[in-house]
Each structure stands twice: as C-alpha cells, then as structure tokens.
C-alpha cells in the first residue's frame, strides 16, 4: 500500500507539472498573439484610440509583478499617440513621465531605445537644438534591441536633415516601408524632401497619396493643408 501511495504521488506530481507547463505555454502563446494584434492595430489599422485603450487595460489589469513595467510603457504609448497626432509638446511631457527604474530589466533596453528615438523626433519637430544634440548622443549610446537600432538611427537622421537642417536626404525614397503607417510617414517626409529639391510635382503626388488616410495623423493633416493651399 505504501508503494502504491508513493506511486500515486509521483503520478499526480507529473500531472501537475505537465498542467503547469501547458498553462505557461498557453500564456506565452496568448501574449504573442496579443502583441501581434496590438501591433496590427497601430501599424495597419491605424486605430489610435483602440491602440491606446489596449495598453491602458494592460497597465491597469496586469498581474502585480508586471504592473509597474506596463504602467511606464503606457506613458510611452501615450507619448507615441500624441506625437502621431502632432501634439509634440504633449508627447514630450508623456515621454518625460517614464521612470525606467520601474521597468523590468529584461524590457528596459527595448523601452529605452524606443523612448530615446521618440524623444529625438519630438525635439526635431519642436526645433529644440540642445535637446536634439542630447538625444542624438543618447540614441548613439543606446544598446541595440531586436536589431532595430540601425533603422531608428537612420530614420532619425533623415528626419533631422529634412525637418531641422532643411537638407535633402533620400532615405525615405530609397527605403521600403514595412507597414501602412510607415508608408504614410515615408510619403510625408518624402514629399518634404521633394520640396527641398524643388520638385513640387512629386511633392504634390506624395501628399495626394496620403491625404485620405486617418486624419488624426499629423502627416495627413499637413498633406491636406498643402493640397488646400494649392486650390
């Protein structure tokens, strides 16, 4: 009987361990699916309200060990959304609320890289030269994350050249956008770049290609202003 009891204990232990492993695999799978949906909501559906709301729920409802990290990430998301809407001062203020010390170390490298890139773009559009210099240096020193740093550095340099330096930079003409939001962004800066070259026909064509997209985006708002000014 004792041997049978021990055998049952081992069996139930194995069943319990198997169930726990299955549960963990399911949780990880659902997290991957959730992140994919959120990514598509921004980059392809471009639904800023739903995108922000999904991160708000994550920040408010996540389990306690993750909550601080998700709350800090939500500040980033709010900064990202206000930037896309063209409220650069509000974006700056949201980014400044982020406390990286509250972020889990395994997530901090990625958030720091994206945050520094975001702060640099905000500074460029606010024409804040000291801040541009500071965040350029921060971005150059930032550790890479998911092999994405080189792309962010190149994009930031191109935007700085076109918007702040008023110099031609063909990055947005020679690089393929990865999604719908990127295509809109590339068309906008490509149009500004065409204007710097004196090619108003190409600028008009690029502005026209995005003028009917989500009007919340400042890229679209500026394209519409340009086209209205021509009429």
Question: What kind of region is each of these model predictions?
Answer:
Residues 62, 66, 103-107, 178, ...:
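Structural signature of alpha-solenoid helical repeat scaffolds
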Residues 35-40, 70-80, 111-121, 149-159, ...:
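"A position-specific structural signal for the A-helix of alpha-solenoid helical repeats
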Residues 1-49, 198:
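Helical anchoring/docking segments at protein termini
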Residues 26-104:
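N-terminal topogenic membrane-targeting module
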